[in-house]
Amino acid sequence: MAGAAPGLVPVIKGNGYGYGLSRLAQESADLGVDTIAVGTAREVSEVREQFPGDIVILHPWEASSDVARELAADDRVITTVSRADDLARISELVSRPRVLIEVLTSMQRHGLRPDDLDRVPTLLERLRVEGWTIHLPLLADGRYAEAERLARAALEAVPAPLWFSHLPPEEASALARQLGGAEGDPVPVRLRMGTRLWLGDESARATMATVLDVHPIRRGERAGYRQRVCPADGWIVVMAGGTSHGIGMEAPTSATTLRQRAIAMATGSLGAAGLALSPYTINGKKRWFLEPPHMLSSLIFLPRKEKPPAVGDELPVELRLTTATVDEIVTS
């Protein structure tokens, strides 16, 4: 992956994709890249000791942020600017700051509109423009055409490297050649990559949880904070992992296909009935929560016919790693 991406810029933000910011900064240093990208200005301090190169701040510059203003003067930091007025303002506050200028895409999140691009050349003497940044949506339909259209508009205003998010390496390389012309050199392109780089190969990792306790329980008995009535004879398996680890934390579904909508409807109906499938696998099957997860542990119901796990066993648990906080990372 690292070798295929032109000008790879690893993205290290938020919870570090489950691994932590400092660990991914060190991994990036080991990859030999010259630049990484963090999400916010405050994340710079968590990675700069582990990574010796340049650090891009993805969140647009805010004049009201003391940290952002201070870092704009740091020669190792490249600040993203998404408004024309902020380009003028940052150039007044800081002597020739290093900036990436964001172009508004169909995501409609941040960026200069096409009719603002002609304001950039008037500020060039007061800025060090490291490139144009184009953050594309995830959908493949129309992605390449949008990238080409915006890139051409940006390059017409100021020739500079193009930094892309969510553009496959092969498309980025093809676009660089296309923009360079039949006889010209490819336009310099850099690819930011986060989820695909750190979480792309699911076979390279496993998330496990420890069995903390096991209790027999009979139908009609109550258990848990909410004193839920047990639906049948079975076992209460107390598993490590709760809301503080990301258990039970789920992003809203996009539900773009009929299958996804059907799953969302079924899940909602079960939730309304007080039933929620847990991410824990016991004896080869995901099992039901007895009640919503606690902060550090979860109560799982296992039917009596099943053999219960032993205290201390480690069992698979499915986690959304972008919202997870794990207790330990073991490298094998």
Language-model regions, residue ranges each:
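Active-site-proximal beta-alpha core segment in soluble small-molecule metabolic enzymes
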Residues: 6-157, 161
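Active-site anion/phosphate-binding pocket segments in diverse small-molecule metabolic enzymes
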Residues: 10, 97, 145-332
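N-terminal basic/disordered segments at the start of proteins
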Residues: 1-2
